[in-house]
Amino acid sequence: MADDWESAADSEIILQNAASTVNKWEGEDDDDDVKESWEDEEEKKDEENEKPTITDVPVKTKPSKALKAKLEEQARLEEEKEAKRLASLTPEEKLAEKLRLQKIQEDSDLNHALDTFGVTRAETNGNGLDSFNPETKEQFKEFGSALSWKVGQYRESAEFPQFVEDLVRGLCIHLSAADIKKVKMSVEILHSEKLKMEKAIAKKAAGKNKGKATLRTESDDIDDYKKYGNDFSEDYDDFM
């Protein structure tokens, strides 16, 4: 009986050792599984962090076809209205309109030039032009607009034409013959346009005066006779 107990105890002990060994290995496997799952989660987090964040972009709503068609129709009507207005203008009125638009463009160029160089209109009345330091072609163009505006303020003076002539001559001294020729051609084109404008204005004024009726009196007829040597006073003296 004792032998049976001893053998049973030995076998039980062996079983417990085997079980503990198996459990130990199983525990080690569980640790490995936990480690691998933890590494997988870390990799997933890294991948999620590496993904670029997508920000919501506001979607621009396109105008409806009906609204777009209405706007295009309004623009077309405005263009037709402006075309009719220009067509009804006389030649001198068209030229005046051209000069008006040119003046608006010059003012716009001047404002742009002043903004570019950080100069105000008030400064151009003093020494503000010294603030300009043009280097590029566009900057020289803007500087020229500002300078023309400044000089043009004295156009009503009787000395202005001679001043411009002297100014152009003084500036052209620094140019080559080829460049002076370009300036000459530009001035000739301007002269031709001005001549057409002045003729159109004079023609319009003559047309208005031509339609006026004149009243002749008896004294006017007598004056005409006197021009040809017929003096009624002499005839009257002879008669007496």
UniProtKB/Swiss-Prot annotation:
The keyword Repressor does not apply. It is found in: Cytoplasm. Gene3D superfamilies: Eukaryotic translation initiation factor 3 like domains. Residues 27-45 have a biased composition (Acidic residues). The keyword Cytoplasm applies. One of its GO terms (cellular component) is eukaryotic translation initiation factor 3 complex. Residues 1-66 are annotated as: Disordered. Keywords: Cytoplasm, Initiation factor, Protein biosynthesis. Signal peptide: none annotated. GO terms for molecular function: translation initiation factor activity. InterPro entries: eIF3-like_dom_sf, eIF3j. GO terms for biological process: formation of cytoplasmic translation initiation complex; regulation of translational initiation. It holds the Pfam family eIF3_subunit. Belongs to the eIF-3 subunit J family. Component of the eukaryotic translation initiation factor 3 (eIF-3) complex. The eIF-3 complex interacts with pix. Component of the eukaryotic translation initiation factor 3 (eIF-3) complex, which is involved in protein synthesis of a specialized repertoire of mRNAs and, together with other initiation factors, stimulates binding of mRNA and methionyl-tRNAi to the 40S ribosome. The eIF-3 complex specifically targets and initiates translation of a subset of mRNAs involved in cell proliferation. This is Eukaryotic translation initiation factor 3 subunit J. It comes from Drosophila persimilis (Fruit fly). The lineage of its organism: Eukaryota, Metazoa, Ecdysozoa, Arthropoda, Hexapoda.
